[in-house]
Amino acid sequence: MSNIPAELKYASSHEWIRKEEDGSYTVGISEHAQELLGDMVFVELPEVGDDVNAGEDCAVAESVKAASDIYAPLSGEVVAVNEALEDSPELVNSDAFGDGWFFRVMPTDLAELDNLLDAEGYQAVIDDE
């Protein structure tokens, strides 16, 4: 069974978010998602300064099995990207909730947080797959 940290929020499309001290949110994919995808070989990230919209694809995770779009859980401006993934995409596999994060977004509509799932709700999504 996948690890689902209780302090994070989740999208049903398997992205997670974590609030940072500056008000931005770090975005990554869940341990469950990386297990389904398998070994990462390439990650395409948005650019700092890009505007992203909740529910729209803004990054790509490519593994030995498939390429998968990564969707923005929140609308806002991309304020940081994880450049370490450029040379080490396998960080997504080894530390999905830590060093394997994708990007940070400064949200423009905090009400969108209400559309995200807690750990229990996300577990229910996985169980229904």
Curated annotation (Swiss-Prot):
CDD domains: GCS_H
Keyword Membrane: no
Top-rank lineage group of the source organism: Bacteria
Residues annotated with N6-lipoyllysine modification: K65
Cofactor: binding details: Binds 1 lipoyl cofactor covalently.
GO BP: glycine decarboxylation via glycine cleavage system
GO cellular component: cytosol; glycine cleavage complex
Pfam name, any one: GCV_H
Keyword Acyltransferase recorded: no
Key words of the record: Lipoyl
Annotated SUPFAM superfamilies: Single hybrid motif
Domain Lipoyl-binding as annotated: residue spans: 24-106
Cofactor: (R)-lipoate
Classification via InterPro entries: 2-oxoA_DH_lipoyl-BS, Biotin_lipoyl, GCV_H, GCV_H/Fam206, GCV_H_sub, Single_hybrid_motif
Alphabetical list of Gene3D superfamilies matching this protein: 2.40.50.100
Function per UniProt: The glycine cleavage system catalyzes the degradation of glycine. The H protein shuttles the methylamine group of glycine from the P protein to the T protein.
Similarity section: Belongs to the GcvH family.
Matches recorded under NCBIfam families: gcvH, PRK01202.1
Subunit composition and interactions: The glycine cleavage system is composed of four proteins: P, T, L and H.
Protein name (record): Glycine cleavage system H protein
Organism: Shewanella pealeana (strain ATCC 700345 / ANG-SQ1)
Gene responsible for this protein: gcvH
